[in-house]
């Protein structure tokens, strides 16, 4: 007599369990599934659960040596997507023990590592993840978080202002440092290395770090405010990255930066640990995110990447603008902005939030609005993002006809005007342009 029947078997027999009650410790995922024609949604959903946990395409005799009931992912609910034919949201619950503690890398390898090339699916998108406290507590999270950052910078009650130094490639270190100084001197809080500035022949990283540090100290001395420049520590190896972070710390600068998707979560988590241990703030740029999150029916939504970053660690992360040159729908953006900053976020499907997320006491991340924004967007940005944000104007500062410093002045004046107007109870959405025009009377740079 044979122990079990060989051959291909339906996943839904084992992995589709509509009556499963999810546990508080389960990691829950919401997938947008587009099955191939002829594949029933239950089978597609079960296939996702199986291939991203314990399953394979047939029964193997070693299945008898483990408890599938304890370790299998389960597709516990399927709903049709309104307005799309043949698209479904499949909800999958993963037992906590499938994941290594404190490793975003392993979490993604398990949940999205294998299943996206699956034949029975035409397309697959991970829309949201519910991270249980039992798992999130195994992560350090952001090196410092919003409150500690405000205390370090001594800046309260307003958004922070930044600017990416352009042209992003081709400046010498000395001219680069000069641009940094002018922007900070004019009134910005931060300037930023572009994400592609690492250590190229025209400007090696050490030279850039030195000139930028000089610019920071000079601007601090002249303005009496704490200034920062996001020194991009991203490098070809983790060791080199940490070496750059150490050099930044020795120069006494407040903040470094990392491209977390191109650099990878393992490198990012290492850097975040270094930053907490050594009092550096960590700015995160999301270069490469659109490769993963741009397609509506395949890939991963950015809110998942944002949650992962909060666990891996970063104090700032780019989060779209809602108003500038890059796409991003307002409600969705606000949804993951809350996921980055708040402690407890209610499920809210209208904002794309599929699960109630409780971060317990993990520090928050400051969202950075950046990309094609300028002073006329300031009222909208102040209203949408609130105080705990960084507003970054690249061309919006350096494009000023009088130069960088006046561009910085214009931005700072506009910001202060908006914050003051808001605190006086005026409606930024309605009177935004009027507020900016009034401010122009006091500031020739803005006019």
UniProtKB/Swiss-Prot annotation:
Q: Name one GO biological process term.
A: photorespiration
* Entry's localization field: Plastid, Chloroplast
Q: Name one GO molecular function term.
A: monooxygenase activity
Q: What is its EC number?
A: 4.1.1.39
UniProt key word Thylakoid: no
Record site feature (Transition state stabilizer), residues: 325
Q: Give the sites modified to N6,N6,N6-trimethyllysine.
A: 5
The answer to whether keyword Magnesium applies is yes
Active-site residues annotated for this sequence:
166, 285
Q: How is the cofactor bound?
A: Binds 1 Mg(2+) ion per subunit.
Chain sites annotated for binding substrate: 114, 164, 168, 286, 318, 370
InterPro entries under this entry? RuBisCO (IPR033966), RuBisCo_large_chain_AS (IPR020878), RuBisCO_lsu_C (IPR000685), RuBisCO_lsu_C_sf (IPR036376), RuBisCO_lsu_fd_N (IPR017443), RuBisCO_lsu_N_sf (IPR036422), RuBisCO_lsuI (IPR020888)
The UniProt entry, under Pfam families, shows:
RuBisCO_large, RuBisCO_large_N
Spell out the reaction equation it catalyses. Answer: 2 (2R)-3-phosphoglycerate + 2 H(+) = D-ribulose 1,5-bisphosphate + CO2 + H2O; D-ribulose 1,5-bisphosphate + O2 = 2-phosphoglycolate + (2R)-3-phosphoglycerate + 2 H(+)
Question: Where does it primarily localize?
Answer: plastid
Give residues annotated as binding Mg(2+): 192, 194-195
For this protein, what post-translational modification is recorded in UniProt?
The disulfide bond which can form in the large chain dimeric partners within the hexadecamer appears to be associated with oxidative stress and protein turnover.
N6-carboxylysine: modified positions: 192
Comment field (misc): The basic functional RuBisCO is composed of a large chain homodimer in a 'head-to-tail' conformation. In form I RuBisCO this homodimer is arranged in a barrel-like tetramer with the small subunits forming a tetrameric 'cap' on each end of the 'barrel'.
Main role?
Answer: RuBisCO catalyzes two reactions: the carboxylation of D-ribulose 1,5-bisphosphate, the primary event in carbon dioxide fixation, as well as the oxidative fragmentation of the pentose substrate in the photorespiration process. Both reactions occur simultaneously and in competition at the same active site.
Subunit structure, as described in the record:
Heterohexadecamer of 8 large chains and 8 small chains; disulfide-linked. The disulfide link is formed within the large subunit homodimers.
Which family does this protein fall into?
Belongs to the RuBisCO large chain family. Type I subfamily.
The name on file for this protein is Ribulose bisphosphate carboxylase large chain
Species the sequence originates in: Camassia leichtlinii (Western quamash)
Gene name of the record: rbcL
């Amino acid at each position: 007599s044979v122990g079990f029947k060989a051959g291909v078997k339906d996943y839904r027999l084992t992995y589709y369990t509509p009556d499963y009650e999810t546990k508080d410790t389960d990691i829950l995922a919401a997938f947008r599934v587009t099955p191939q024609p002829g594949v029933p949604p239950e089978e597609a959903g079960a296939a996702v659960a199986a291939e991203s946990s314990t399953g394979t395409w047939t029964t193997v005799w070693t299945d008898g040596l483990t408890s599938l009931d304890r370790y299998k992912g389960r597709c516990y609910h399927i709903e049709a997507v309104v307005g799309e034919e043949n698209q479904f949201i499949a909800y999958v619950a993963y037992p906590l023990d499938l994941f290594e503690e404190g490793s975003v890398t392993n979490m993604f390898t398990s949940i999205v590592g294998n299943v996206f090339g699956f034949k029975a699916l035409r397309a697959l998108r991970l829309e949201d993840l519910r991270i249980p406290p039992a798992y999130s507590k195994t992560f350090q999270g952001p090196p410092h978080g919003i409150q500690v950052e405000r205390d370090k910078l001594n800046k309260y009650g307003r958004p922070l202002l930044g600017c990416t130094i352009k042209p992003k490639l081709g400046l010498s270190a000395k001219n680069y440092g000069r641009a940094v100084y002018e922007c900070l001197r004019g009134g910005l809080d931060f300037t930023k290395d572009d994400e592609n500035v690492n250590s190229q022949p025209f400007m090696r990283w050490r030279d850039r770090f030195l000139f930028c540090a000089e610019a920071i100290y000079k601007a601090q001395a002249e303005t009496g405010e704490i200034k920062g420049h996001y020194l991009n520590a991203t490098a070809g190896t983790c060791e080199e990255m940490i070496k750059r972070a150490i050099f930044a710390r020795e120069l006494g600068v407040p903040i470094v930066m990392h491209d977390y998707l191109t650099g990878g979560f393992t490198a990012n988590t290492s850097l975040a640990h270094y930053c907490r241990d050594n009092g550096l703030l960590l700015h995160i740029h999301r270069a490469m995110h659109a490769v993963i999150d741009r397609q509506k029916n395949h890939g991963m939504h950015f809110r998942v990447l944002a949650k992962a970053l909060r666990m891996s660690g970063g104090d700032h992360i780019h989060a779209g603008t809602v108003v500038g040159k890059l796409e991003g729908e307002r409600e969705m953006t606000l949804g993951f902005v809350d996921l980055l900053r708040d402690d407890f976020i209610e499920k809210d499907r209208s904002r794309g939030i599929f699960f109630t997320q409780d971060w317990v006491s993990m520090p928050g991340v400051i969202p950075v609005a950046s990309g094609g924004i300028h002073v006329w967007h300031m009222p909208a940005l102040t209203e949408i993002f609130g105080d705990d944000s960084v507003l970054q104007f690249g061309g919006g500062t350096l494009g000023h006809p009088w130069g960088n410093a006046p561009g910085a002045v214009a931005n700072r004046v506009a910001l202060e005007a908006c914050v003051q107007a808001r605190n006086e109870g005026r409606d930024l959405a309605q009177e935004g342009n009027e507020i900016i025009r009034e401010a122009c009377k006091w500031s020739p740079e803005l006019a």
